[in-house]
Amino acid sequence: MTKRISAEEKLNRKPISRACVFCHEKHLQCDVGRPCQNCEKRNIGESCRDNVRKVRKTRGRTPRSGVMNLRRARREHEDELAIATKSRGAGEPGSTGLPQVPSLSTLFDANVDPVIDEELLPATYVDPLGPSDVELPTSGAESFGSVWASSEYTKLNEILGSPGIERPRKHVPSKYEPFAVPATAEHSPSPSTPIELLQDHAGLLFRNTLRRHISLDTAQSSYQASTQDTQASTVASSVSCEGAQFPASEAEYTSPYSFRQLVRSPEDLYRHQNSIFPHNYRQAYLELLNILRARFLSAQDEIAREEGPKQLHSIAQSIKTYYAPIFVTLTSNLIESDLKMHELILQRTLLEYENMSKMVNCIPMCIWRRSGEICYVSNEFISLTGFSRRELLMRRRFIMEFFDNHGIVDYFKLFNEYLAFSSKEGFSSTSDGQAVFSECNLLMANNSFLKCACIWTVKRDSFNIPMLVMGQFLPIFDMDHT
């Protein structure tokens, strides 16, 4: 073992610049003599020599001469600055020699000399325009470098156009705005009826002025037609059912019941994947608009007729404020192949949900698309409501048809604000933001309503776009205590 040394010896020892090979390997305190004392004690003084250090890699490093030149140049520059500061301080009495920091008002004052002389800046850093000449693009002549910049500009214009916020100047509609309105209608009053407001807001989901495939409505005919760009100008007028130009959906629409007869397993799905096209959400929303119009504006009950327009206005406002802006942003870069993949993933997920409901005894369950179209109902749901499977799945049916008026308003509020994109907090929901708990009145086959506690779970795709909503309903039986 190595001999222990006292504290005094440790203090008297002085470090050396380079140890011998033996002391370096054994991590011993070496001395300047050769051979050193450690090697002499071990009778290996013949082999005692200085340890050779490894040469540092100099690749990518500045040569020593270059470093010295840089240091010398920096030192000369500092000396020049010091001389200039002293001369300036000598000419101004009371100056402390410290650099004067300009205020914010000085920085934005065009009449004051710039803080940095433009002659010292490279040509690429000199702004060719003055501070007053720079402004945001407001006309269609300008172009953005990316779709994301265009979408962000659209959202800013949308914020400026919100109620209660006055615009500082007249705004000209741009080709980058997916829901731009004419300039003459900038200060026009709001629609006189809630259905006009709903049609106006529903148009936000159908227009595709940013890109060819930005909207919800990519029907099967979009794969065959080559005149899609020429139809963009007429999409706004097609929101109303009277002037709508769309194919006969009943002839092309494949009901969930018929589709399940053809595709019963994942193998069948991939075998017929070339025959699967993106879902026609545009036609679905138009039919949903007719249902909401009939429910809220054509009610026979006097109280329902009075509250109907207000409730319809609330639904439209919820779609416009919470759902449409985020949806347009997420779908701005989607192409036809993405929409087809979206439909394939939806059908594959639906098969998994169906198998899950058959393997376990679950509470009544119903699955529908983001548009509200029912895709699947469990046996327990059929037993609870009294409707047959063919009644629910043989034609296009919406989950809103089985709620009362207040339930429809609550559903749209929960879906748009909390469930679709998990964009809002503060409601009773799961930690991952994919499910919410609520109550609703569910329609029975005898036209009566049954109060149910429900949980709505959303399934999103890789683009964070909602595909399916799974609703589970647990009946609540009120017991009368007498």
Curated annotation (Swiss-Prot):
Keyword Zinc: yes
CDD domains found in the cross-reference section: GAL4
One GO CC term on file: nucleus
Location of the PAS domain: 350-422
Superkingdom in the source lineage: Eukaryota
DNA-binding region: 20-48
Annotated keywords: DNA-binding, Metal-binding, Nucleus, Transcription, Transcription regulation, Zinc
Annotated compartments: Nucleus
An example Gene Ontology biological process: cellular response to starvation
Gene Ontology molecular function terms on file: DNA-binding transcription factor activity; DNA-binding transcription factor activity, RNA polymerase II-specific; RNA polymerase II transcription regulatory region sequence-specific DNA binding; zinc ion binding
Main location (coarse class): nucleus
Pfam families named among the record's database cross-references: PAS_13, Zn_clus
Family membership noted in the UniProt record: Belongs to the ERT1/acuK family.
Function: Transcription factor which regulates nonfermentable carbon utilization.
Protein's name according to its UniProt entry: Glucose starvation modulator protein 1
Gene source species: Eremothecium gossypii (strain ATCC 10895 / CBS 109.51 / FGSC 9923 / NRRL Y-1056)
